Amino acid sequence: MFVQAPPTPNYKWFSCISSTVFTALCLLPIFSAAGYAQTPQNRVIKIGVVQRFGTKATDKLTLKAIPGDSLTLSYKTPQGTETKTVASIKLEIANKPLEAPLVEERVVLSSHRSFESAEDSANQWRAKGIDVEIAQPLRWQVWAKRDTYNSPLVRRWLLQSLQAQGNKTAFLDTKVFKQIPQTFWVLNGFRFNRNELDVTAGKNVIEVLEQTTQEATAIEPEKAIQETRRYGGSLRLQKNAYGTYTLVNEVPTETYLRGVVPHEIGAFSPYASIVAQTILARTYALRNLRRFAVDNYELCADVNCQVYKGLAEVYPQSDRAIAQTSGLVLTYENQLVDALYSASSGGVTARFGDVWHGPERPYLRSIVDSPNNVWDLSKQSLSDENNFRRFMTLKKGFNEEKEETFRWREEVSLTSIGGFLKQYLQKKKHPLANFKTVTQVEVVERSPAGRVLQMKVQTDLGPIDIDKDEIRNAFYPPISTLFYLEPIYNADKTLNGYAFVGGGFGHGVGMSQTGSYNLANLGWNGSRILGFYFPGAQVVPLGDAITFWRE
């Protein structure tokens, strides 16, 4: 199935780059007090800015108008839709006792670190005739579609059928609730209990104060968090697939980019890098609108999508890049590219298939991240362990050579490896999750670009294989999959642990953000930078002939 852009109106597209007058016009705010109009080039997108409101009974959200403005609340009553005008509103949570326990149950077919691999898994299940949906309760998961498998009998029949065919990863996730979170607010002495609320502002800017509690981790205790953001567009509070609430920001794409670009690439980065990042961020957003269909919104506001901080911190350089590239996207054969980027590549970018499961993208190739001829991958494949280790000794001639994460080393004991791996396997409900000891870890296979494709862990219960980007979830040290292992021995020559010796930060597919800095400083413009990291792709104005993605 092809998902295409809406029809393009008949108008002249122009660049804001050269004309002083046009530049001044383009740098005006992207929203105004008069409101905003959705166009094919500036469609309104739905961002889950607070994804799990109500997880804690102490969660609070305060929505405020900016000075000189007011908020309009819209909500359902038995008599129809009612509206109220206020300066601010405080949303709180009360745990509502249930007359009878509520059982929520789903068949989880697979669990993944990333949406990309989850989507490939979903497509494989669909090819087998199983109706599925993608969700993200914590990790990304593929569920048997709840509307289709809507009874305990049908769900158990499906699970038993899969197990009879040898499937060991699918499981039944069952939760029993004696109470559920209910959002409420108090207005003029009356308490309103509602599951949906729409909030607009005359000037299309709403301030959000979020108060919540961050759960304790292995290295940090539980702590209270208070954060204030400003969002353009409107807000909607709605139920999600997990029994809590999501605050959704409905915002024009170009306004959304103001809260993304400076926080992804850095507000004071070289300007050509900011331009390249802007085109990628726009392309990424439009290509990934399907990510949260299960929750009835489109994108999140963190690193599982793109970091989005609203309008509280916007900067002239990124605003200028957004205005000057208005409507420009990166395409390959009239389809939006998978506009991937990471902090640093470690000197060589990865193919899509080096990191995730799914079809290769022809424009996402393994490229030595250097303007110079420092290594020839066609003659010295990094799948060869000796070549790879020699490559990792190189420190000069690369775009990222001055970056701290270009090369790194982290030592970890077998005990720590085992503890971290056990947590990972328990979340996946892996059959060997209750192992007691790890005796050996090894790299089994790596790609021609040097990325680790598979690792094997020997435990007292048997071997466990970890592949591709799951490696970064299963082990604590590696911040990329571009690494090798060095054993560390005790004084008595028994194995104590391993040093992970590697390079880069992130998945390494597509554009290296720090690599783009060097290319920009060499005088490359944004389009040339994108051409380097996405060979064969083209920067074009968004139009109705462009396919957003293929399902």
List the predicted regions and their residue ranges.
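Conserved, single-site charged/polar hotspot
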Residues: 2-6, 10-551
